[in-house]
């Protein structure tokens, strides 16, 4: 996406691709398709979208459609997801973006789970998952057992409690089993 007037904003040398553009949709699908063809043993992809849309304009959309940019972006994202899901139905996909920023009902048919937050501290996580469960089913929330001490809070929480909290969503691990 690009600013139509003024200078573009770039964070950590990243920009958001214009998914309203079918050529960009083909490009992104092609990357995933090439990856899956080259490495067919891949069975899990985390789709990380931790970049806010800062450049509010599309070079693809005509000027009278710029107010529809967010809608067209989302529709283009769904088209890419539909193609990936159709070609790779057994591939597990996780949507991840800044604490659930990609968690929306429009993309739930294409993703098996979404990442609620990078904060994996079980004591804090239980409140996040409880709140999220008001809107989304528990099975959609990726919930992982993490190491102790926690890498964000440095809190040491008993393994059983961390497992219990992680089991209230879609269970995963951010820890080597041998280190449990």
What are these regions, as identified by a protein language model?
Residues 21-47:
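An active-site-proximal structural segment forming one wall of the substrate-binding cleft
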Residues 40, 77-180:
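Active-site-proximal substrate-binding groove within the catalytic cores of carbohydrate-active enzymes
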Residues 47-54, 97-102:
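Short, solvent-exposed turn/loop segments enriched in Gly/Ser/Thr/Pro and often Arg
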Residues 1-6, 10-11:
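Single conserved hydrophobic/aromatic residue that forms the stacking wall/gate
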Residues 2-3, 37, 86:
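Solvent-exposed polar/charged
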Residues 7, 56-60, 104-109:
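Short acidic, glycine/serine/threonine-rich loops at helix termini
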Residues 12-29, 62-76, 150:
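The substrate-binding groove and active-site-proximal loops of carbohydrate-active enzymes
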């Amino acid at each position: 996406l690009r600013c139509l007037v003024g200078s573009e904003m770039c964070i950590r040398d990243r920009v958001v691709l214009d998914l309203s553009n079918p050529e960009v949709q083909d490009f992104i699908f092609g990357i995933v398709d090439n990856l899956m063809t080259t490495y067919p043993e891949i069975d899990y992809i985390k789709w990380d979208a931790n970049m806010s849309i800062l450049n509010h304009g599309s070079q693809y959309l005509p000027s009278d459609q710029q107010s529809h940019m967010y809608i067209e972006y989302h529709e283009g994202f769904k088209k890419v997801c539909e193609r990936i899901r159709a070609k790779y139905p057994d591939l597990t996909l996780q949507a991840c973006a800044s604490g659930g920023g990609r968690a929306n009902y429009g993309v739930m048919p294409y993703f098996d789970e979404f990442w609620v937050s990078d904060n994996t501290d079980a004591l804090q996580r239980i409140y996040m998952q409880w709140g999220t469960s008001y809107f989304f089913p528990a099975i959609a929330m990726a919930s992982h057992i993490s190491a102790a001490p926690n890498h964000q809070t440095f809190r040491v929480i008993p393994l059983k409690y961390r497992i219990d909290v992680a089991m209230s969503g879609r269970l995963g691990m951010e820890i080597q089993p041998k280190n449990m």
